[in-house]
Structures are given as structure tokens and as C-alpha cells.
A protein has these predicted regions:
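Canonical positions in the second alpha-helix
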Residues: 25-26, 57-58, 91-92, 125-126, ...
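Structural marker of alpha-solenoid helical repeat scaffolds
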Residues: 28-29, 61, 94-95, 129, ...
Length: 414
């Protein structure tokens, strides 16, 4: 390991020219085992070209060592040198001990370029040679997972888990949970998330588990996992929204608002946080707070339709007519129009006794709300008040079609 320390320092400094010279000298002076170790180190630090140079040197010295060809092929694939990789793998004979691994490398390549049937064929060929090899079964499971065959993938991984197979760097319980979750089988995923969390309460696993519990409406448990997540990783931003939604489902709106404002404190540029905070504030009856949150959401995205609609509806409901009109004018300056605001603006101008503007927006709204009986009724009485009887007659005829059981519309025509 001592011989690797100078390489680590040079790689951390990013001095490629010096590194090349050191690699050349190492290939002349040191033994093959240490050279192979250097190739691993270079790969680990991302110096792929230098790792290839080292392995090519070893492959020249030991052409019968097929593992070197596989290592080279994998590095060539990282550099998108598919032809070089395929040529290297084609030199491995079927009777070689390394042939199953070569097939697995080919399967990875075909999976990467989307030729899933070819990839599966290569894996099956390798399994036929080594039927008890867990790594090959796992590779097949991953392929099934990627191609959306979730139940098959989960069953295969469960068999691996039951056989006590251990794969370096793989938590089979977590993998099974992820597969079931991807297939929306959250009930089946939950026991495996629980197993995975007993080994390590990693932030991503806590989030995934929290989401699974949320999906099956076990909100208290979801909140427990999400609170734990945010305690150990306050910068796991998506945890705040899910926690707030969880509290909202429990009708703990104060806690929901607290969770989402914590999220805003961590990420003040996430418009969805402000929208959610606005909605929860409305549920709590805090109109002014809701207005502030919604205004912030729109400031971040002037075309954020959900926030615009809710704020417009709030202004209309509270008869904050001037605020509604100001919002519309501000959006118009941004070259953004939202037709769902037209009925609200018509009512606002009518309340302000600005009848010409009200009529203008009623007409604009009419084109898209001809089947909205509530809007048409308002428009009808506005037209009658304004003396526009012919236009009112047209609206009455439409209301008769929409609400034939309402005698009021027929009485008006008599």
C-alpha cells in the first residue's frame, strides 16, 4: 500500500502528466500483482485511460489470463469504446473459467443499450454454466427489475435472500423492498424496508420506507420514519413535503405547517413548499399567511397555475377585488394569461361597479364556461341588470338545456 501513496497524492492533485510518468516507471519496475493493484486504484479514482494502459501491459505479458480481458472490456465500456470491449470479450474461449463472467459483462452491455432480450439470453447462458452462482441470479433479477417485470424480479431476489446468499455491497432486503415499491406493491415492500432499517437507518431508506407507509395509509409510522430522516439529514429536502403531507392526512394541520415551513427554511426556492404552506394556512383559517405563501410561490414562478388559481380564488372569496385585479395585471405584464381567472375578475369588477370591465370579462369567460351553470346564472343576472335582454335570452336557452328540471329558466321566457 505504501507504494500507492504517491499515486494517490498525484491523482488528488490532478497532475495527469506526472501521473503518466509514474505509471510508466511502475510498469517497468514493479511486479505484476502490484501493477494489477495499481490498475484497481486508478479505476477507483476515475483515471480510466491510465488503468487501461496498465491492464493492456499485463494482458500483453499474460495473454492467457482472461480476467484481464474482462477488466479491460469493462473499462472500454465506461469510455463508450464498445468495439474494443466486444473484441476483448470475443477472445475468451467458452471453456474458460472466466466465460460466465464474460457473458455477464456482455449482458451488462446489452442491457445498457436497451437490448434486453439479448441481455437476458446472455445471463441465462451464464446461469446454465453456473446454476448455483448468486451473482448471476442477482444480475437476472436486476434485469427483470429494469424491464418492469417486478413480481418475477422480487420472487428471484426473495429466493436469494432465503438461500442466505451474500453479495458484496448489496442489501437484498432493501432491493426487494425497492422492487415491490416500483410495482406499487407497498404492502409487500414494508416488511423488507423494516428489515433493511434494522441493519442501517440510512436517509434514503427512511424516506422510501416513509413513502411506502404513506401509500398504505399508515401515517403515524410514516411520520416516525420521516422525522427520524430529517433529524439525521436536515438537508434531505423531499422529506419535508412528504412529512407535511403525512401530517395533513392525519389532520394535524399545525404540524403540517410546521414541517413545510422547516422545509422552506432549508430550501427557500422550492415553489411547491410555498403552495402547500398556502393551502394548509387556508385550512387553518390564516388568510393573510396563506396569501403571503402563495405570493411567494408565484414570485418564484410567475406561471405557476396552481398557486395563481388558489390565490385568485382566495381573493375572490374574501372579496379582495383590487388585489385580484392587481394580480391579473401583474401576470399580464409577464405575458401570462389564465382564462380560469376571467369569471372571478368579472365578479370583482361587478362588485366594484365597474360594469364595462365586468361585461368584458364575462364575455371572455363565457367562451370557456358555456356548460358551467353557476357561472351562467351570474352572467344572466348581470346581463338582465345591464339591460342586455337579447344576450340574456341566449343564456336562458343554454340553462334550460343544462337544467331542464329548473322551472325558473322556463318561467323567464314567458
Amino acid at each position: 500500500m505504501e507504494k500507492m501513496i504517491p499515486f494517490i497524492r498525484v491523482m488528488e492533485d490532478g497532475d495527469i502528466e506526472k501521473l503518466d510518468g509514474m505509471v510508466d516507471a511502475f510498469l517497468l519496475e514493479e511486479n505484476p500483482d502490484e501493477q494489477y493493484g495499481l490498475a484497481d486504484l486508478l479505476t477507483e479514482y476515475g483515471f480510466i485511460q491510465e488503468a487501461i494502459k496498465t491492464l493492456e501491459h499485463l494482458n500483453f505479458l499474460f495473454p492467457e489470463e482472461d480476467q484481464l480481458k474482462i477488466d479491460l472490456a469493462q473499462l472500454f465500456l465506461e469510455l463508450n469504446k464498445e468495439d474494443d470491449a466486444l473484441e476483448m470479450l470475443s477472445n475468451i474461449e467458452k471453456n474458460s473459467e472466466s466465460y460466465p463472467q464474460a457473458l455477464l459483462t456482455l449482458a451488462d452491455y446489452y442491457q445498457m443499450i436497451g437490448l434486453y432480450e439479448v441481455a437476458e439470453h446472455k445471463i441465462e447462458e451464464a446461469i446454465a454454466l453456473l446454476p448455483g452462482e448468486p451473482l448471476l441470479q442477482y444480475a437476472k433479477g436486476e434485469l427483470l427489475f429494469e424491464t418492469g417485470r417486478y413480481l418475477e424480479a422480487a420472487r428471484l431476489m426473495e429466493d436469494l435472500l432465503a438461500s442466505k446468499s451474500e453479495l458484496q455491497g448489496v442489501d437484498l432486503s432493501l432491493k426487494i423492498a425497492e422492487i415491490y415499491s416500483a410495482g406499487a406493491a407497498y404492502e409487500e415492500a414494508i416488511p423488507y424496508y423494516t428489515e433493511a432499517l434494522q441493519k442501517e437507518a440510512a436517509p434514503e431508506v427512511l424516506f422510501q420506507a416513509g413513502y411506502a407507509f404513506f401509500q398504505v395509509r399508515q401515517y403515524e409510522t410514516a411520520a416516525k420514519h420521516l422525522n427520524h430522516l430529517l433529524e439525521i439529514d436536515p438537508d434531505f429536502f423531499s422529506g419535508y413535503m412528504l412529512l407535511a403531507e403525512t401530517y395533513a392526512m392525519l389532520e394535524k394541520n399545525e404540524e403540517a405547517l410546521s414541517a413545510i415551513t422547516d422545509g422552506i427554511a432549508r430550501d427557500e426556492f422550492e415553489k411547491e413548499y410555498y403552495l402547500f404552506a398556502g393551502k394548509i394556512s387556508l385550512k387553518l383559517g390564516r388568510v393573510k399567511e396563506a396569501e403571503g405563501f402563495l405570493q411567494e410561490a408565484i414570485a418564484l414562478d410567475p406561471e405557476y397555475m396552481d398557486a395563481i388559481y388558489i390565490l385568485s380564488s382566495l381573493f375572490s372569496q374574501e372579496e379582495m377585488d383590487e388585489e385580484l385585479i392587481d394580480l391579473y395585471e401583474t401576470l399580464k405584464q409577464e405575458q401570462f394569461e389564465m382564462s380560469s381567472m376571467y369569471p372571478l375578475l368579472a365578479s370583482a369588477y361587478e362588485r366594484l361597479e365597474m360594469y364595462e370591465k365586468a361585461y368584458e370579462f364575462y364575455k371572455l369567460a363565457y367562451t370557456e364556461h358555456k356548460e358551467d351553470a353557476a357561472f351562467l346564472e351570474k352572467y344572466l343576472y348581470f346581463l338582465l341588470e345591464d339591460g342586455k335582454r337579447e344576450e340574456a335570452r341566449e343564456i336562458i336557452l343554454i340553462l334550460q338545456e343544462l337544467q331542464p328540471e329548473n322551472s325558473e329558466w322556463f318561467d323567464m321566457m314567458e
